A protein has these predicted regions:
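Conserved helicase motor core of SF1/SF2 NTP-dependent helicases
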Residues: 1-206
């Protein structure tokens, strides 16, 4: 399994040492699969900043280049500007676009408010997980295992993804590695620490 995606503390492990000693009596060989085939090099390099922060092995992206990860400082409830960002992605004819929030309540609120502005968007929750294509809003936890053409993280601030909390960091990593082609990271206030330096260099002013 991928330790970086073990987002549930009550049923996850921090390393393989205990498993090797307790389940295999140290009689096994541990191999690491470090290739990433989903995302572009640019997205994976940014996501690796999160892994490095929590001391996990970083993934090696296959040689597929794309656009740089984009950072935009924006108020969490500035739905008109968020809609602008979604529409820019829609113009590229992507089949699947996801807005990923920290939890399900935030994801539903995002979907409801964007729908009021006329966006055709589906809210994905624990009781409503059907999704084929189009634009959707969901939590970081529910995004695990899914992939989209493009992803917008709705708020990657330190308040939402604490750099001192490994579960937050793993959820951030999961969210960042969902897109096939493009990743845009919005944040309100201070961006989470692992992404701070990169965001300061590459943020979008408008």
């Amino acid at each position: 399994g991928d330790l970086a995606q073990s987002i549930y503390d009550y049923r996850s492990i921090d390393n393989w040492s205990d498993v090797i000693s307790q389940s295999f009596d140290n009689d096994c060989k541990l191999e690491y699969l470090l290739k990433s085939y989903r995302t572009t090099m640019e997205i994976m390099n940014s996501a690796n900043l999160v892994l490095s922060h929590i001391g996990l092995k970083t993934a090696t992206p296959v040689i597929r280049h794309g656009e740089d990860v984009r950072y935009l400082k924006i108020k969490e409830n500035d739905y008109n500007r968020i809609l602008e960002r979604v529409n820019l992605l829609k113009e590229k004819d992507y089949q699947s676009i996801a807005l990923i929030s920290r939890d399900t309540d935030e994801a539903k609120e995002m979907a409801d408010n964007l729908a009021k502005l006329g966006l055709d968007i589906k809210s994905i929750g624990e009781d409503n997980v059907d999704y084929d294509s189009g634009i959707c809003s969901l939590s970081s936890e529910l995004s695990k295992g899914l992939e989209f053409d493009a992803v917008i993280l709705t708020d990657a601030s330190e308040d939402k993804y604490s750099s001192k909390d490994n579960t937050d960091m793993k959820n951030l990593y999961v969210s960042m590695t969902r897109p096939l082609h493009e990743l845009e990271i919005l944040y309100d206030g201070e961006i989470t620490l692992p992404l701070k330096e990169e965001a300061e260099k590459t943020f979008i002013k408008r």
